[in-house]
Curated annotation (Swiss-Prot):
The lineage of its organism: Eukaryota, Metazoa, Chordata, Craniata, Vertebrata. The keyword Cell membrane does not apply. This sequence belongs to the VH7183 subfamily. It comes from the Eukaryota. This is Ig heavy chain V region 914. It comes from Mus musculus (Mouse). One of its GO terms (molecular function) is antigen binding. One of its GO terms (biological process) is immunoglobulin mediated immune response. Keywords: Adaptive immunity, Immunity, Immunoglobulin. InterPro entries: Ig-like_dom (IPR007110), Ig-like_dom_sf (IPR036179), Ig-like_fold (IPR013783), Ig_V-set (IPR013106), IgHV (IPR050199). One of its GO terms (cellular component) is immunoglobulin complex. Pfam families: V-set (PF07686).
């Protein structure tokens, strides 16, 4: 059974920082590209960041330079470091395979 469990969310003031984690299990984590997506208060889904199995990273312009996706293949954890947060970053964040 594939499981992705996010943690690290919370309330942050504009300009603040937050780091999210996603613990993965049930598949060979290191073999898969992984992404973060978010659902806005208006229920719109937005792509936030992706990282390939080899570590290449991809971002939309809206978060480039502010968000950093990374992975720990030894621990099967995906990360999203968010900084310079804005009101428009308010959302529920989810990791995805």
């Amino acid at each position: 059974e594939v499981k992705l469990v996010e943690s690290g969310g919370g309330l942050v003031k504009p300009g603040g920082s937050l780091k999210l984690s996603c613990a993965a299990s049930g598949f060979t984590f290191s073999s898969y590209a992984m992404s973060w997506v978010r659902q806005t208060p208006e229920k719109r889904l937005e792509w936030v960041a992706s990282i390939s199995s080899g570590g290449s990273t991809y971002y939309p312009d809206s978060v480039k330079g502010r968000f950093t996706i990374s992975r720990d293949n030894a621990r099967n954890i995906l990360y999203l470091q968010m900084s310079s947060l804005r009101s428009e970053d308010t959302a529920m964040y989810y990791c995805a395979r």
